[in-house]
Every structure is written in C-alpha cells, then in structure tokens.
Amino acid sequence: MISQREEREEKKQRVMGDKKLISSSSSSSVYDTRINHHLHHPPSSSDEISQFLRHIFDRSSPLPSYYSPATTTTTASLIGVHGSGDPHADNSRSLVSHHPPSDSVLMSKRVGDFSEVLIGGGSGSAAACFGFSGGGNNNNVQGNSSGTRVSSSSVGASGNETDEYDCESEEGGEAVVDEAPSSKSGPSSRSSSKRCRAAEVHNLSEKRRRSRINEKMKALQSLIPNSNKTDKASMLDEAIEYLKQLQLQVQMLTMRNGINLHPLCLPGTTLHPLQLSQIRPPEATNDPLLNHTNQFASTSNAPEMINTVASSYALEPSIRSHFGPFPLLTSPVEMSREGGLTHPRLNIGHSNANITGEQALFDGQPDLKDRIT
C-alpha cells in the first residue's frame, strides 16, 4: 500500500513538473539556478524528475550528425549548452557523473512508458519552447538539447528542400539551355533544307540539258557517214568537214550542168521574169535556125548568171577566173548565112570551153576531184 501511494505521488509530481516545464517562459534561468543549487545542495526529488524528463526528451529526439559522442554521453546533452567557455558546464558534468542514482530515479525508469504517454507529442512543442540557439554566447543556455535538435532537423529539412529546389532549378536551366540550341538550330536547318532543294533543282536541270545535248549530237552523228567518234569536239569537226564537202559538191554540180538545173534553189539569186524566160530550156522545134538562136541567147546570158552565182557562193578568185564569156567563132549574121554549118562549130566550142574550165578547176584544187569521185 505504501509503495502504491508513493508511486501515485511520484506520478502526480511528474505531471506537475511537466506542466511547470511547459508553462514556464524563463526556463533557461531556472535551469541555471538549479545547476548552481546542485553545486551546493543535494538534489531533491523534483530535480531528479526534471532530469529524468530531460533524459527522456534526449532519447526521443534523434541526434544531429554534427554532435560528437562526448556531448551525447555527458550531461551537456541533457542541459543542451552551446559554447565551450561556460564554467557551469564543467561543474554540471562532474556533478552528474559522480552523483549516484537514487531509488526514486530507478522507480521513475519503471514508469517511463507512462511518462512518455503523458508527454507524447508535446515533446516537440516543449523542445521548441525550451530550445533556442546560442552559438558562441556563454550567457545563453538552452533548457533542452532536443530544441536544438528539432531546429537542426528543421534546418536540415529546409536544406533538403533548398537542395531539391536547386536541383529543380538546375534541371530547368538545363532544359532552357537545351531549348536554346534547338531554337538556334531551327533557322540553320531551314537554310540547309533550302540549299538542298536548290541543289536538287539545279542537278535536275543540268541532267535535262545534258540529255538534250546528247540527243542532238546523236542525231548529228547519224547524218555524218562513217562517223565513229564519240567525243563532242571530234564529232563537230567531222560535221564541219562534211558540210564543206557538200558545198564543194554543189558548186561542181552547178558548173557541170549549168544554171538550168535548179535556178530557183540557189541561195542569194533573185531572177527577174525576163531572165527566167531566157533561162527556160528551148522548145523542140523543127527549125534549126530558131534552135540555134535560142541556144545563143542562153549562152550569152550564162556568164552573167555564173558571175552572180559565184559572187553569191563567194568562190575563190581562181574559180572565178575560169568563168568567162564563151568564145564565139562567128557573128549572128554569118551564122544565118552559113546555116547549119555554124551550129556544130558552136556546140564544139561550147563543149571545149566547158572541158577546159573543168580541167582548170581540177588543176587548181586537186583535192576537190578526189572528194567528188
């Protein structure tokens, strides 16, 4: 019975002590006076209860990383003193380390669970009430180290939050940096695509032009006989030589057959109706005199037509020298008197003149004879 009463009294004292700790605003000064009182007087039961509660607070709250093991094992962790120059801290350490535990403390440990239930969530608020930062100041003393631990944990949480924010900001910055080159690469990609399209169009036009040129060269090669060249320069040379040969052949044909072959097809010749009537071949009649006069008229107009043809074709002087007036053996009056005797002479002279002209032309240009043959 007596033990039960003592336990009840101790519980009441603990509850009262908790209420006093929570309601007191100047806990640091109270703890300082209690520490000084412990130096001269033996500890009372209320002081032991308060120490026990502090010890429970210390166990309930996690220790930060920057606390050393020496501070956790000594009584400085119970009192929560910051700073190295406090003389009361050394005295309290020596006092608590040499103070033997009493029976009330042992009994209070047995009912620690009940005290923890009573204190519960109020430890954080009590720690917030008692704990305050006093780094470097010898006069400022914390009532409970849990306050500093809670504050340090809050600081750690805030530090983690800032780290997360920094990480997010860095990620956002990287995203912005990644977007910036993409925005810069946009115009460059457009310009490169435009250049590629222009190059493709140019290549297609070049292919079409080359295909047309090849087709024309093939057509030209088909017109030239015995053409075996493949390059364009040699094919053009052969075409030029072939055209020169054709011009010479046309000139020789005009010289052999006279102007009566195709007078209207010659380039650069404009013939009047009178000349056309003179150039027309004579009609076959029974009168030899009319036939002779028609031939004489045609031969008298022949040198003028030959000169015009030679000038139109721009013949060489050596060729022009051979085109002269045909020699007339007799006059028209003598021809009319002699009758049919002069007709064969005229024909013979005309044929001789043609032969001598062709021989002189071949003597001046021997290559022309080979090409024609």
Swiss-Prot record:
This is Transcription factor SPATULA. GO terms for biological process: carpel development; circadian rhythm; fruit development; negative regulation of seed germination; response to cold; response to red light. It is found in: Nucleus. Induction: Down-regulated by the A class gene AP2 in the first whorl and by ARF3/ETT in gynoecium. Keywords: Developmental protein, DNA-binding, Nucleus, Transcription, Transcription regulation. It comes from the Eukaryota. The gene is SPT. Signal peptide: none annotated. GO terms for cellular component: nucleus. Residues 141-160, 182-191 have a biased composition (Low complexity). Residues 161-177 have a biased composition (Acidic residues). Residues 197-246 form the bHLH domain. Transcription factor that plays a role in floral organogenesis. Promotes the growth of carpel margins and of pollen tract tissues derived from them. Residues 1-21, 197-210 have a biased composition (Basic and acidic residues). Residues 1-46, 141-210 are annotated as: Disordered. Its main location: nucleus. Expressed in lateral root caps, young leaves, stipules, maturing pith cells of the stem, differentiating vascular cells, shoot apical meristems and flowers. One of its GO terms (molecular function) is DNA-binding transcription factor activity. Homodimer. Interacts with HEC1, HEC2 and HEC3. Binds to RGL2 and RGA.
